[in-house]
Regions:
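Surface-exposed amphipathic alpha-helical segments
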Residues: 21, 112-139
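Residue-level recognition of conserved beta-strand positions in structured domain cores
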Residues: 34, 45, 102, 113-114
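Short C-terminal domain-edge/linker segments immediately following a structured domain
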Residues: 36-38, 46-47, 53-55, 63-65, ...
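Short flexible/disordered coil segments
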Residues: 33-41, 87-92, 133-139
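Signature of long, low-cysteine stretches enriched in small and polar/charged residues
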Residues: 60-108, 115-118, 129
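Generic beta-strand structural signal
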Residues: 23-25, 104-105, 137
């Protein structure tokens, strides 16, 4: 995918997103979107001071905030070329479609959320997979 590189302000991670997408930072949370699509990708960054991240627990915690019943059997798991663990799940709530990703490597964690008021099509899923797979932790 041709794209632009986003590097977090604290230099913890970077990834590639489509060059025709725009970016906006709201309350220190970067958001990425195509101006003609009905959704937005937001990236939340965390680091544990002690011990490694338990991605499944972090994903479950995020889902529970939205009062969604968590079902671990519906979580997809994969690893990118950097050895970064990625968990993915999706849900619908109040006419919004959500894709949530927990991306971790040792003590570092990103929660990436894409939410849209329209159903997510195959093209968008592929774009999201490319973005998420391109994540590299820097520190």
């Amino acid at each position: 995918m041709k794209g632009k590189r986003f590097t977090s302000p604290e230099k913890r991670f970077h990834f590639i997103y489509p060059e025709d997408w725009e970016t906006l930072v709201v309350e220190d949370i970067p958001a990425f979107f195509h101006p003609e699509m009905g959704g937005v990708l937001q990236i939340y960054s965390f680091a544990h001071k002690v011990g490694n991240v338990d991605s499944m627990t972090e994903l479950k915690n995020y889902i529970s905030v939205h009062e969604i019943e968590f079902n671990e059997e519906l979580v997809a798991t994969f690893t990118n070329s950097e050895g970064t663990n990625i968990l993915s799940c999706e849900f619908k709530k109040e006419d919004r479609h959500w894709c949530v990703y927990a991306i971790s490597n040792q003590n570092k964690l990103l929660i990436a959320t894409f939410n849209s008021d329209i159903d997510i099509d195959d093209k968008t899923y592929k774009i999201l997979a490319s973005i998420i797979s391109s994540v590299q932790f820097l520190k």
